[in-house]
Amino acid sequence: MTANSQPAPPPTGTPTPLSREWWKDAVVYQIYPRSFADADSNGVGDLDGITSRVPYLAALGVDAVWLSPFYPSALADGGYDVDDHRDVDPRIGTLADFDRLVAALHAAGIRIMVDIVPNHSSNRHAWFRAALAGGPDAPERALYHVRPGTGPGGTEPPGDWRSMFGGSAWERIDDRTPDGAPLTGPGTPRPCQWYLHVFAPEQPDLNWDHPAVREDLLTTLRFWCDRGVDGFRVDFAPGMAKDMSEPYRPMAEIPWWPLPEDGSHPLLDRDEVHDIYAAWRALLESYDPPRFAVAEAGVAASRRPAYAASLGQAFNFQMQDADWSARSIGWAIDGGLADEAVCGSTTWVLGCHDTPRVTTRLGFDPADDAEGGEPDPSYPAGIAQRMARAWIGADGVAPPQNAVQGERRARAAAMIVMALPGAMYLYQGDELGLPEVPDIPEGRLQDPIAFRMRGKEKGRDGCRVPLPWTATGDSFGFGPNGGAEPHLPQPVGWGAHAVAVQEADPDSTLSLYRDGLRLRRRVWGAANGEPLEWVRRDERVLAFARGGVQCWTSFDADVPLPDGDVLLASVPLGCVESDGDGGNLERAVNVLPADATAWIRPAAPRSLPRPDRS
């Protein structure tokens, strides 16, 4: 968070002019930089690699890219442990590389968003190093949540709060003199001190009641806006405002989920967080055109609109959580439309860097769920997510997973999302139908969840495996042949999913995404502002209409489609003969098979001949 001395260069390109609130119906492509494209052969994706693939992004048809963290980091949490929010990790590039990327994207009509991680810094951040080096009375400790321990000499943590990554949310500081004598703890006048970390110990939580913390983040926002950034994704947006008054409430009273709807959780979703965002919004809107931010806000649905109002947009993860059923997908659509009604926009998310791949998730049958039990009627989702994590933990052995079915359903789900009003966030590789990689060897795992929850969770590395660009090569085109091995291992058959392979196949998942995103802009974009109307909604079928075009999805069996032009289908359609008008003529009727979606422009009703009354 210390300011880098390099000034922003003058703008060298601007994206195609769009609405001042372009993000409300944009397609935003999430790039996990370390796994996208490696230009310098070090086994880690980099900014120049992304720049080299801008033509691919343009051909895909996205409106913006969102870069996950590319800042200096020890990678204790995939880059979300940030050493300096205003610089670039030298393994990924330089600020000059970043400026070239911005110019290339803008020249292609693509906007750029960057990840901001405000809840915590890394333990290598200059502030935290000073807080440790300065001893128990270091003023920098006020920038974090440092508290005395309990028990003899303060050797026990201040409370029983648990980290989201497993283990205690408190880490003890080992304060000693230069010659190694303890400054705190048993045998000294002062108790041991502990710092709070909601995530990994390498990610100490910042104290957002401190004015220096607030001002520094505003400086960071200005820094990137001045370099041409168009928007920000706010990591863990509900987390900054905290009630640290004692006594600390026991963890049994404050689970991480579900969160209370009254803002009473001491660590998450407190009303005071919106006071912080008010200053951010004022800064972002001082630019012309205005910048915006989208909140990663995993909060109760009733609390989500406040984040959209504060920042511009908030993620709705209901579609990502949904299982493959008409009930679950319909519930997700209802949630997104409710957000749109309140906020004027909504978001649709099928996957991201934190969740098992959609192609894998949708290959599970909830009937095979080992936990079983009656589903929560207020939350008819999450079974496939849970089964996928169990499957990953078992190295892809159990529970049973149908890869072919998963890919088929993921294609159908993508077409549903493309047809809905609002913004679509697309995670890199989902357009290739990439599956989760469940069997990464333990020695190659990077995610702290795998280590802090050993035996329970294997973590998120399986959705972060470097992309395949070519069918062959040392890293399937991720990096040059002869370069370093990719930072995460790619499966042997990864090349079958490669961009080069799919570009040559008009029926590939990549071709479906390209066709779908092109039609989304031309067909569904023309319907923006028009209400979504349900055509059919039951246990087998979801069908809705917007602007004279219908989106039909079958979850069960073959479904006859209405007469009209089929604009796009996730699989080849069947065809049957049906009785025509009057029962004496036959006509062909398109049939939508199970686990498939089609877009149709219905035919105009045919006028029947007037009866002869002479």
Q: Regions from the language model: what does each represent?
A:
Residues T2-D563, S570-S614:
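Active-site and adjacent substrate-binding regions of carbohydrate-active enzymes
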